[in-house]
UniProtKB/Swiss-Prot annotation:
Keywords: Isomerase, tRNA processing. It holds the Pfam family TruB_C_2. It catalyses: uridine(55) in tRNA = pseudouridine(55) in tRNA. SUPFAM superfamilies: Pseudouridine synthase (SSF55120), PUA domain-like (SSF88697). GO terms for biological process: mRNA pseudouridine synthesis; tRNA pseudouridine synthesis. One of its GO terms (molecular function) is tRNA pseudouridine(55) synthase activity. Its EC number is 5.4.99.25. It comes from Histophilus somni (strain 2336). Belongs to the pseudouridine synthase TruB family. Type 1 subfamily. The active site is at D48. Coiled coil: none annotated. This is tRNA pseudouridine synthase B. The gene is truB.
Amino acid sequence: MSKPRKKGRDINGIFLLDKSQGMSSNDIMQKVKRLFQANKAGHTGALDPLATGMLPICLGEATKFSQYLLDADKRYQVIAKLGERTDTSDADGQVVQKREVNIDLAKILTALEQFRGEIMQVPTMFSALKYQGKALYEYARAGITIEREARPISIFELKFIDYQIPYLTLEVHCSKGTYIRTLVDDLGEVLGCGAHVTRLRRIAVADYPYNKMMTLEQLQQFSEQEDLDLLDQHLLPMESAVIRLPGLHLTKEQARAVGFGQRIKFLNEQGIQGQVRLISPENLFLGVAVIDENSIVHPQRMVVIKPE
């Protein structure tokens, strides 16, 4: 007879993981979930096994707001090796082409101009994007190439950091859906020498502070103290995922109504429309709602806090 499954905790919050190289985002998310003994967890946009850096892990009710972090802009530091193109556009792939690197800094700075602002990008075959229910990387590993349409992305900032032939270091601030490997591969083709990613580190997601990140090893050390309250101190509030939305402060009666999923009308003197954070009279985060043109508040994603 199998043992009954151990019930997880109803813990809510966001853990800023500093992902190490080599692990998949899903594997490391499951480890974080177990260390917190959480009943539910989800990450907010996978990092390649080769990549390191910021990976927000949503626990409990915070998973309802993970999409906002998936959609958030992100910042990366990347080291590209010029002169070699690989099938995956990173160092985990096979080299498919080698070319001489005879590129000066002036040519690099000129080439970077083409990739700033609103641009179109064709997603890499080695991605988790789905085609007929299967991830593109599954087709790629089988030697099958699927036609992909170019998609609009935004490169808010593309900063030159360093160039020591053949290694080029850049910092990229970009919109959701941007593939840094593809950006580097495309840059290599513009330069005429080819390029691939050798190191990639995500240094920011939305407005989360870099210094709040913690590695899995550090989290394990706290876990070994068997003090869950101490562990929970390293969680950020789930409201932080939607902090860019305007806040709407409710009365006690309004808060009770939206808690039951009811729509409410309010005196909208500021003419607010669209998504808002709902705040209780006790200054507690209740969830996210949409205000329509008639100043009707429609609850969208509400927090459910179970009594202890």
